[in-house]
A protein has these predicted regions:
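Conserved, well-structured core segments that form or line functional sites
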Residues: 2-236
């Protein structure tokens, strides 16, 4: 993908809330290369974002997104998606792990960017300890390659120590969060269908996954149940 598609800007350095005012489809590619830090009593962990997905909900322009949690109505679960832009939406996925989203669009309009994958840039030992703690006992002693510590949304949330109870609805511009834009625009961005999303929402009609090509931390593409067939868009 060439720079300029999907409204990619040259915003670098520190972010402010206006960065998240556009909808998720505009913001998702701009987050590639940004660095997110999450502090805790154990210490901070930072991750450089290498893969994102956009989800569009109530009040947004464009096609109806059947893959979005906020596609039909506001609920207790998705309430954070309707907050001011620049807040965290953390949910529990498949009864197994947490996933982190950044809230976009003006208040009351629901869109969010799923932070799918990243590369840990500091706090590696703490991220590793958290990942190993979450592993089943039979795998606990097997080493985890550093490039895989935050590969996939569940692993990323675990490495950063995120939970719904502690982090859902928090402001990304206040502790324990800190976020900084990429120091320079990416040389290239790839796009394709979203990973593991069922039905038409996981097909080529919704090429709303964005990633940095050549990054080993990026997920391998896996189609969702009953998703329309498309050429694999695994990271290259």
């Amino acid at each position: 993908m060439r720079q300029g598609q999907f409204g990619f800007s040259r915003h670098t350095g520190d972010m402010d809330r206006t960065f998240f005012l556009p909808d998720a489809l505009s913001v998702a590619p701009q987050l590639l290369g940004a660095v997110l830090t999450v502090d805790s009593a154990e210490g901070p962990v930072s991750v450089r974002i290498t893969e994102t997905e956009a989800y569009m909900g109530l009040g947004t322009n464009g096609p109806y997104d059947p893959g979005s949690h906020s596609k039909d109505r506001k609920t207790e679960r998705n309430a954070s998606m309707f907050l001011d832009p620049g807040h965290a939406y953390v949910y529990f996925s498949y009864g197994m792990h947490y996933a982190l989203n950044f809230v976009c669009s003006p208040p009351g309009i629901a869109s969010g960017v799923l932070i799918r994958s990243g590369a840990i840039t500091s706090g590696t030992e703490l991220a590793m300890a958290r990942r190993l703690e979450k592993r089943p006992a039979r795998y606990a002693r097997n080493p985890i390659p550093e490039v895989q510590l935050a590969r996939g949304p569940g692993n990323l949330a675990a490495a950063l120590g995120l939970t719904r109870l502690a982090h859902d609805g928090l402001d990304l511009f206040s502790p324990p969060f800190a976020i900084h834009a990429a120091p320079s625009p990416p040389a290239a961005i790839r796009t394709g269908p979203r990973v593991g999303v069922a039905g038409i929402a996981g097909g080529p009609q919704f090429p709303w996954r964005f990633w940095l090509p050549g990054e080993p931390s990026v997920s391998t593409f896996r189609p969702g149940r009953d998703a329309p067939a498309s050429r694999s868009n695994a990271a290259e």
